[in-house]
């Protein structure tokens, strides 16, 4: 289907959140799955739009955002900004856990309040990272490849030489797609179930 890539604008925030809700579980939707539909995008979309909108791009079909790519040029800097500027916003809406996470939603909340877990030593040589999501009708048509190319150029211009992304084990099609684009898996000892893949930015 016809769509074009453009830089993110502030008015795209609800559209990006909608796409995240429709795709936020390894490409499948999470609408109605948690106590609020904002839970997943508040972890996987909002902080990037708020903290580093200069590296955010949307796929626009002329009516709305139907896909996006977001991320950071420096994961350590992003984690510091998340803790200083994004977590206070989250604490106004969500209650930190008082004990170990037990449910799926509690595991999401646990991840939300502990961004420092993203600072893994094996990923240090790959400072940039990204998240990409497209609605089903806009997959397998070159849009994902073009979004990734656009993002890598953006973070390269900001000084990042290499980028990583994470793929859940169940998302076999996504891993196959990334490997076709030249992303290579790396061993990460303390990773949650899934795979990390890396790619130079230029």
Regions found by a protein language model. Give the residues of each.
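Active-site rim helix/loop that mediates acceptor-substrate recognition in acyltransferases
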Residues: 34-56, 62
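Conserved acyl-donor/pantetheine-binding loop and adjacent beta-alpha core of acyl/acetyltransferases
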Residues: 76-131
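Conserved catalytic-core motifs of GNAT/GCN5-like acyltransferases
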Residues: 76, 166, 179-198
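Conserved beta-strand in the GNAT
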Residues: 58, 64-73
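Conserved GNAT acetyl-CoA-binding A-motif
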Residues: 126-128, 155-168
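A short beta-loop-alpha structural element at the N-terminal edge
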Residues: 4-18
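Conserved active-site alpha-helix within GNAT-family acetyltransferase domains
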Residues: 125, 130, 141, 145-146, ...
């Amino acid at each position: 289907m016809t769509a074009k890539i453009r830089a993110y604008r502030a008015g795209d925030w609800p559209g990006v959140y909608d796409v995240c809700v429709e795709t936020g579980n390894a490409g499948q939707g999470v609408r109605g799955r948690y106590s609020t539909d904002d839970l997943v995008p508040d972890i996987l979309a909002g902080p990037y739009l708020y903290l580093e909108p200069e590296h955010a791009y949307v796929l626009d079909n002329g009516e709305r955002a139907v896909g996006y790519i977001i991320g950071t040029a420096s994961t350590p800097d992003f984690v510091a900004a998340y803790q200083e500027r994004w977590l206070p916003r989250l604490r106004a809406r969500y209650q930190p856990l008082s004990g170990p996470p037990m449910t799926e939603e509690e595991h999401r909340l646990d991840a939300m309040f502990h961004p420092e877990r993203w600072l893994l030593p094996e990923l240090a040589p790959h400072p940039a990272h990204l998240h990409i999501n497209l609605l089903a009708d806009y997959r397998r048509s070159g849009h994902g490849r073009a979004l990734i190319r656009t993002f890598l150029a953006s973070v390269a211009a900001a000084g990042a030489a290499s980028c990583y992304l994470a793929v859940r084990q169940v998302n076999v099609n996504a891993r196959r797609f990334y490997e076709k684009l030249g992303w290579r898996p790396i061993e990460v000892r303390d990773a949650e179930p899934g795979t990390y893949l890396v790619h130079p930015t230029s």
